[in-house]
A protein has these predicted regions:
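SAM-dependent methyltransferases
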Residues: 1-2, 49, 58, 143-146
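Helix-adjacent hinge/juxtasegments
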Residues: 45, 49-84
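Glycine-rich phosphate/diphosphate-binding loop of Rossmann-like nucleotide-binding domains
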Residues: 1-24
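A short beta-strand-loop structural module common to alpha/beta enzyme folds
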Residues: 28-39
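C-terminal binding/interaction regions
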Residues: 4-6, 10-11, 89-146
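Alpha-helical segments flanking ligand/cofactor-binding loops in enzyme cores
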Residues: 20, 47, 51, 73, ...
Length: 146
């Protein structure tokens, strides 16, 4: 499975930590983030991750900025993307099981590396349940088509 990962300047170290962790778990990682700590604009990287997932270049995406909010907003502007901001594993798990999220976002200023690993693992291990949740996800996706 291929995972696109993108980040702004606040999240270089956490991106590297999560990338290494993903590789240890056997995932292929596509680095779409910056490796510079000079100030940059998170929407660029949120869009890159979103497009990689929407276009099928990656199966899933991870987006990291200071809080996770801005980069997730940018990713969510890409049609077909369901990005979620998670700061603990339970929400990450349910975002996959109930909302079929395809981009995980978190904040480098909010979660440390160990918690970020736990969030990532919970998200990746969870599977979409379908059923009533599929109907609701389809309703969300219909909003994009209006």
């Amino acid at each position: 499975m291929k995972i696109a990962i993108g980040n702004d300047h606040t999240a270089v170290d956490l991106k590297n930590t999560i990338s290494d962790y993903l590789k240890e778990l056997g995932y292929e990682v596509i680095n779409l983030g910056t490796d510079s700590r000079e100030s940059c604009d998170y929407p660029i990287y949120g869009e890159k991750v979103g497009r990689a997932v929407a276009d099928g270049e990656a199966d899933l995406g991870i987006a990291i900025c200071g809080t996770g909010v801005g980069i997730s907003l940018a990713a969510n502007k890409v049609k077909g993307i369901r990005a979620c901001v998670c700061s603990e594993p339970y929400t990450a798990k349910l975002s996959r099981m109930h909302n079929n999220s395809n981009v995980l976002a978190f904040g480098a200023r909010v979660v440390g590396s160990e918690l970020a690993k736990m969030i990532t693992e919970a998200w990746l291990d969870a599977k979409f349940e379908g059923g009533r949740h599929e109907r609701r996800v389809n309703m969300i996706m219909e909003i994009e088509n209006q």
